[in-house]
Each structure stands twice: as structure tokens, then as C-alpha cells.
């Protein structure tokens, strides 16, 4: 280029710093600069001492590294017609410095210039620094070194220690000096013998002394007996916990040394500890465990599990601030096998994916092996009497009986009760104690749950919700209800001579009980002296067999009134599993007694002429009830009602999907999702997956 004909661009690299300048070219083709002037120029550029011994090299036109020694070498450079001249500078020991120290002396013969002495050590350190940071560090170092060299002898001695920083990763041998050849050099003149940092002490003395703490608050001269550096077993250089000056362990004034591999929060206010095991434990992660103090996930280092609160853990930082030693258990290592339940703590030991309740398993001895988290639970089996939609007279007392099964993993103890949880209140008490034997109700056993009610005075539809609970009020199990229709026209329809009949108790196969009174419900209390009352205990069984459409229609229109005709002698009374009984008035052409679950059925039962009309009325009534419960899809409700023969209980179960959803709904309520209608809809959408429901609720899923 034209610019190189008049001047030559010279680039000088030293300590990772690159400087450039131009040197004019004379008419005879030689540089207007001699070798001495070039060294002075380089020393001025990098703030080097004037008497520093500089070793200059460059790459010739063939790519070989050539040394610049005298003016003849500069003349040869101009003859090569290079586009630019890049010079690599290596600074050596000053020519005016004292003789090198002997290997057996503990102190040098003379104190060299501190700045020139530390240059090589810093240069070696900078070689390991990434390129983006190398230029910045070099400039800062040059400024500090030039200003601090004349400040005090103490600073000079500190700089002497810093000059050995580059030797910390070199394995120490028994010889006091170890020659190191810098990469890229091509001659004996370019090699430099770097004195070993351990040359001031005997190896045997260093081995016996070991590492000793260094107090940096004392003058540097106080450490004349500091042991030498012990080589690192890993071979990866100096440890962060070592002093870079002598290789000894540092005694930080701060109680917690900074660990660069950890989160910075762990350094600020972690527990004071000088034990090396503490820092080792910080590498332990408790997967899936969140600190309930600061919210960090997962907990790193020791985990402190509360003995007082359930599912409460603290990390080391929060424990040092708010923890009490007696209330927490320290866990230095994570649990080897830990199944994490996303919502309600750990899984039971024997989970069953098909059931909502834990399944106890028998051990070799035959005793049931309880789950790790046993719980009380109950499941509705059937309505023993007063099925949904029963028509009663105003102010008529009656007893509702539900058959419930113990579906949990604990025995129902004495004191278990059923409590009112919502809906219409037409019972004199908010809770009723159950008749439970001393040994309790075993698992998978059934119990008749009885509650006395009094029908409201005003006509209309009434529903009351109940749920089982422990003696201390903790509710459990499925929700049950009683649904009645109060009809004012039935109040005066009962014949006085039958006022002693009480059909709250299911009829028993007793010869003293008149069969012609089956199915009649009296709105008055039973007279103590009445001989027609059989107060036996009701024992219900599961419904079996099919129920016809006529039976389903009449089931929803159970009338309370009088009945004069007698039942034919050939018919036997219904079993205790009967859900309803129907009695026609005298004006009707025949008397019907229908049994919902009995194996014995009536013969030649006539179908009422108004069957279609009544069936339509029942369907409309049940559709309204389902809509009030939250089931808004009318077509689906009709289909479910017809499939279940207008049995409201079975229809609700079918609309919910499966009865096992009740525990999931309870769990969603405990998590704060209290809209049962939305929860059921999302459970149906996600096929009973609680994870899918929670994700939809958290993402703001709205009902279409």
C-alpha cells in the first residue's frame, strides 16, 4: 500500500496489551529508528523502566519467529517489505539489579525494582485470563504498579509476593528452581528461569509445618516463618481458600468466606461455621423441597424439617434467623427414595390408582397393613327409606335412613356423628350421634344412619345436606341429602283410625304387622299404645334387579294419605331393601305395592292412565333440581335420567362421572377451589385428572 512506502506500522504486544505506532522510512529504505530508540519507545508505551532488559521477537515473511537484537535486524525487516511489523515483547531482569539469590539463602542479596520483578508473574497470570478481560486488567495493573512502587517498602514486599502468583499452579519439586519456557519462544535467549516460590524454605520443614493461617492485618514481615505452598492434589491450581502469596490457608476476617460456586444469597447471612463439612454440604440439593421461609426451590445444603408444623422446611439461612434447635430436625442428605405428592403431601405407602381411598394389604401374619396416612372415609350405599322426591304432608315428622359404608382405612369410633352442612334446615338438631358399638365400625362394614326430620309447614321442595364427622367436628366422607316435596293438600287426607301407623321404619316380616297398611306414611307421631306399630331396626341391603319405567314414575310421586283396600293375600311385603311403596286411593281401580329391590314382585300391576303425563312432570321436576345443583346441560340431563330410570341419586353420580370424584372435590376445596360445579365440569373434561383440573383453574379456564 502507499502508506507503507513512507512509514511502517509497528504493532507491539506486551502483557496481553497491543499498542501501535508508525515509523518513517528513509529514502534509502531504512527505518528512521534505531534499536535503542525502539526499546525506549516500547518502554515508554508500557511504562517499563529504562534499564529493563527487553526481549523482542517478530514473525518474518515465512511465518517464523525471529529475534530483534540489533540494528541489522531492523534493516532486514525493511528489506522484507512487510505490510506491518508486529513485535512481541518479553521483559527480563534489570541489568542493574543485584546478583541472583542463591538457593540456600533465605533472603535475596539485594532488593530489585518491585515493578520489574512482578511483571513476569502478572504476565503469566494474564495468560489464563479470557481475552475480553485481559486488556482491562493489564491497564489497571500498570497504573497501580507504577504508583505503588515508591509508596513504601511494605508495598514493595507485597508486590514481590504478587509476582509469585503465576507459580501457584506449578507443582513444587525438591529442587529450589524450576526452569519454565514460555510457549512460542525459539531460542535459549527467550527462556526465563522462574524462581520457585518455595525456595526460601526447606522442603522437610514445609512438610512438617503444614498449612498455617495467615493474618493479613499484621505487617508482611511478621510472616517470615510462613510455610511454603503444598501442591494441590487435583492439579487444577490454587484453592480459593488458600492465600495466593504463600499457599497457606487464609483466615478471613469475614466469618464466611465467599464460595464462587454457590448462589450469592448463601454467602451473605449463612450460619457461621469453620468446619469444612459445612461447605461440602452446600453441594447437596433436596430435590422438590421448597423453603417455607424464603421460598427457594430446591433447598441447597442442610435441610431443617419442622417437628411442630406438618410439611414445613427451612433452609440454612432461614433457620439461622427464625429456627429453634428443638423444633427442627437437620437433614444433611436428601431422602434416598422420596415420592412427592403435588398437592397433599407424600403418597401413601400402597397407593391404588383405581380407587380414591388407600387399600390396606395383609402381612404374612394376616393383619391388615395400614397405609402411612390412614384416614376416615365413608361412602353412600343407598336410601333405605324416604327416597328423593317423596311427597309428605306439612309438619309431618319422619326419619330418614341412609346406608353408609366405611370406605376409609380407620375404624369409625364411638362418637362419630352426622352433621348438617347446608341446604334447608328442617331438623331440630345440627348434628346427630350415630349408634356405634364399642369396637366401632370396621372397614368395609355398613351402618344405617338415621336422622329425625319434621317437614316444613309451607308447601314446596326442600333439600337438606348432611355429612359424617368425628366427635371433634372434622368432616369426612361423601355428602348425602334428603329431598322431599311438601304438599298442603295431604294434610287432611289421613283417616283418624290409622293415625297410629308409622312407616318411618321399614316393614318387618312380622305377623302382627297388618299387610294392608304397607306404604302409608302418617304425618302424626306414632301413639305409644298403638299395636300396629313395629319399631324394629332397619337393616338395608343393596338394590338388586331391574326397575320398570312405571315403578320409576311412581317412585317420584310417593303420596302420603289413606288407603282402605287390602292387599291380596298372595302378595308378600317388601324386603328391607325396598326404597319406596305406593298405595292408591279407593277411587283408583286397583291397589299397587311396588318393591324397588325385592326379589318378589307383584303380579298384574295395572299401569295408570296418567303415566305419560306424570312421567313428563317428574322429568321436568328432576331437570329443575339438576339445574339447581349446577348441571346446566338439559339434553345430557334428560339422557342420564332416562338411562337411570329417573333415579335422582344414580343420575347425579352418572353426571359426576364416578363416585370416586368426591375425595378429589374435597381436595380441590382444601386447595381453595370452592366452586364444585366448575370442578366437576373440569374433572369430566380431564377424565378425573386432578392435575389437569388444577392447571385449567390456574390458567383461568372459564366455563363456555
Swiss-Prot record:
Effect of residue 11 to A: Loss of homodimerization; loss of capacity to form large aggregated cytoplasmic structures
Effect of residue 60 to A: Loss of homodimerization
UniProt xrefs under Gene3D superfamilies: 3.30.60.90, DNA helicase RuvA subunit, C-terminal domain (1.10.8.10), Immunoglobulins (2.60.40.10), Phosphatidylinositol 3-kinase Catalytic Subunit, Chain A, domain 1 (3.10.20.90)
Effect of inactivating the gene: No visible phenotype under normal growth conditions, but mutant plants show enhanced sensitivity to heat, oxidative, salt, and drought stresses.
Keywords: Acetylation, Autophagy, Cytoplasm, Metal-binding, Protein transport, Stress response, Transport, Vacuole, Zinc, Zinc-finger
Keyword Acetylation annotated: yes
InterPro entries to which the protein is assigned, alphabetical: Ig-like_fold, N_BRCA1_central, PB1_dom, UBA-like_sf, UBA_NBR1_C, Znf_ZZ, Znf_ZZ_sf
Sites bearing N-acetylmethionine, chain numbering: 1
A Gene Ontology molecular function term of the record: ubiquitin binding
Cellular component GO terms, alphabetical: autophagosome; cytoplasm; vacuole
Pfam families: N_BRCA1_IG, PB1, UBA_NBR1_C, ZZ
Phenotype for residue 661 to A: Loss of binding to ATG8 proteins
Induction trigger: By heat shock.
ZZ-type zinc finger segments: 286-336
Start and end residues of each UBA domain: 657-701
PROSITE patterns, per database record: ZF_ZZ_2
Binding partners and assembly: Homodimer. Interacts with ATG8A, ATG8B, ATG8C, ATG8D, ATG8F and ATG8I. Binds to ubiquitin.
PANTHER family: OVARIAN CARCINOMA ANTIGEN CA125-RELATED, PROTEIN ILRUN
Name of this protein: Protein NBR1 homolog
Organism of origin: Arabidopsis thaliana
Gene name, Swiss-Prot/TrEMBL: NBR1
Amino acid at each position: 500500500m502507499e502508506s507503507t512506502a513512507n512509514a511502517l506500522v509497528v504493532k507491539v504486544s506486551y502483557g496481553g496489551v497491543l499498542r501501535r505506532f508508525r515509523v518513517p522510512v528513509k529514502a534509502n529504505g531504512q527505518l528512521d529508528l534505531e534499536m535503542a530508540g525502539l526499546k525506549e519507545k516500547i518502554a515508554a508505551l508500557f511504562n517499563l523502566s529504562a534499564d529493563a532488559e527487553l526481549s523482542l521477537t517478530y514473525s518474518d515473511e515465512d511465518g517464523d519467529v525471529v529475534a530483534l537484537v540489533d540494528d541489522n535486524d531492523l534493516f532486514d525487516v525493511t528489506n522484507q517489505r512487510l505490510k506491518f511489523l508486529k513485535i512481541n515483547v518479553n521483559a527480563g531482569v534489570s541489568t542493574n539489579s543485584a546478583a541472583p539469590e542463591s538457593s540456600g539463602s533465605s533472603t535475596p542479596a539485594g532488593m530489585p525494582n518491585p515493578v520489574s520483578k512482578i511483571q513476569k508473574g502478572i504476565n503469566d497470570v494474564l495468560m489464563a485470563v479470557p481475552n475480553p478481560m485481559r486488556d482491562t486488567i493489564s491497564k489497571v495493573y500498570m497504573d497501580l504498579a507504577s504508583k505503588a512502587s515508591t509508596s513504601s517498602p511494605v508495598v514493595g514486599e507485597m508486590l514481590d509476593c504478587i509476582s509469585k502468583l503465576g507459580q501457584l499452579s506449578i507443582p513444587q519439586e525438591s529442587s529450589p528452581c524450576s526452569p519454565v519456557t514460555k510457549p512460542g519462544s525459539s531460542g535459549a535467549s527467550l527462556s526465563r528461569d522462574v524462581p520457585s516460590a518455595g525456595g526460601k524454605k526447606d522442603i522437610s520443614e514445609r512438610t512438617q509445618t503444614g498449612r498455617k493461617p495467615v493474618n493479613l492485618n499484621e505487617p508482611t514481615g511478621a510472616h517470615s516463618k510462613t510455610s511454603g505452598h503444598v501442591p494441590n492434589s487435583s492439579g487444577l491450581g490454587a484453592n480459593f481458600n488458600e492465600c495466593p502469596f504463600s499457599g497457606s490457608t487464609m483466615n478471613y476476617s469475614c466469618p464466611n468466606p465467599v464460595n464462587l460456586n454457590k448462589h450469592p444469597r448463601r454467602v451473605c447471612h449463612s450460619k457461621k461455621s469453620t468446619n469444612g463439612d459445612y461447605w461440602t454440604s452446600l453441594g447437596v440439593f433436596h430435590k422438590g423441597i421448597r423453603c417455607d421461609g424464603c421460598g427457594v426451590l430446591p433447598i441447597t445444603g442442610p435441610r431443617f424439617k419442622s417437628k411442630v408444623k406438618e410439611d414445613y422446611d427451612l433452609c440454612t439461612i432461614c433457620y439461622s434467623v427464625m429456627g429453634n434447635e428443638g423444633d427442627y430436625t437437620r437433614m444433611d442428605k436428601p431422602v434416598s427414595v422420596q415420592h412427592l405428592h403435588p398437592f397433599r403431601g407424600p403418597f401413601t405407602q400402597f397407593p391404588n390408582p383405581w380407587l380414591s381411598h388407600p387399600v390396606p394389604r395383609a402381612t404374612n401374619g394376616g393383619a391388615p397393613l395400614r397405609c402411612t396416612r390412614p384416614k376416615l372415609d365413608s361412602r353412600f350405599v343407598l336410601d333405605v327409606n324416604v327416597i328423593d322426591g317423596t311427597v309428605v304432608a306439612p309438619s309431618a315428622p319422619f326419619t330418614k335412613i341412609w346406608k353408609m359404608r366405611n370406605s376409609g382405612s380407620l375404624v369409625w369410633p364411638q362418637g362419630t356423628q352426622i352433621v348438617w352442612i347446608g341446604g334447608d334446615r328442617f331438623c331440630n338438631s345440627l348434628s346427630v350421634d350415630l349408634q356405634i358399638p364399642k369396637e366401632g365400625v370396621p372397614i368395609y362394614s355398613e351402618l344405617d344412619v338415621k336422622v329425625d326430620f319434621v317437614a316444613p309447614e309451607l308447601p314446596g321442595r326442600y333439600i337438606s345436606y348432611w355429612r359424617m364427622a368425628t366427635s371433634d367436628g372434622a368432616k369426612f366422607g361423601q355428602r348425602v341429602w334428603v329431598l322431599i316435596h311438601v304438599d298442603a293438600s295431604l294434610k287432611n287426607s289421613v283417616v283418624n283410625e290409622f293415625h297410629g301407623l308409622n312407616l318411618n321404619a321399614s316393614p318387618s316380616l312380622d305377623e302382627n304387622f297388618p299387610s294392608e297398611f304397607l306404604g302409608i306414611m302418617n304425618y302424626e307421631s306414632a301413639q305409644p299404645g298403638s299395636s300396629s306399630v313395629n319399631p324394629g331396626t332397619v337393616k338395608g341391603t343393596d338394590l338388586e334387579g331391574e326397575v320398570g319405567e312405571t315403578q320409576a314414575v311412581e317412585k317420584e310421586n310417593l303420596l302420603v294419605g289413606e288407603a282402605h283396600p287390602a292387599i291380596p293375600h298372595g302378595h308378600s311385603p317388601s324386603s328391607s331393601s325396598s326404597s319406596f311403596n305406593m298405595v292408591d286411593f279407593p277411587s283408583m281401580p286397583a291397589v299397587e305395592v311396588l318393591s324397588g329391590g325385592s326379589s318378589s314382585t307383584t303380579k298384574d300391576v295395572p299401569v295408570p292412565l296418567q303415566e305419560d303425563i306424570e312421567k313428563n312432570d317428574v322429568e321436568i321436576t328432576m331437570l329443575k333440581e339438576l339445574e339447581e345443583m349446577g348441571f346446566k346441560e338439559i339434553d345430557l340431563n334428560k339422557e342420564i335420567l332416562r338411562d337411570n330410570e329417573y333415579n335422582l341419586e344414580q343420575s347425579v353420580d352418572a353426571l359426576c362421572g364416578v363416585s370416586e370424584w368426591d375425595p378429589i372435590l374435597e381436595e380441590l376445596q382444601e386447595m381453595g377451589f370452592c366452586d364444585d360445579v366448575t370442578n366437576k365440569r373440569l374433572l369430566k373434561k380431564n377424565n378425573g385428572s386432578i392435575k389437569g383440573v388444577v392447571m385449567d383453574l390456574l390458567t383461568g379456564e372459564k366455563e363456555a
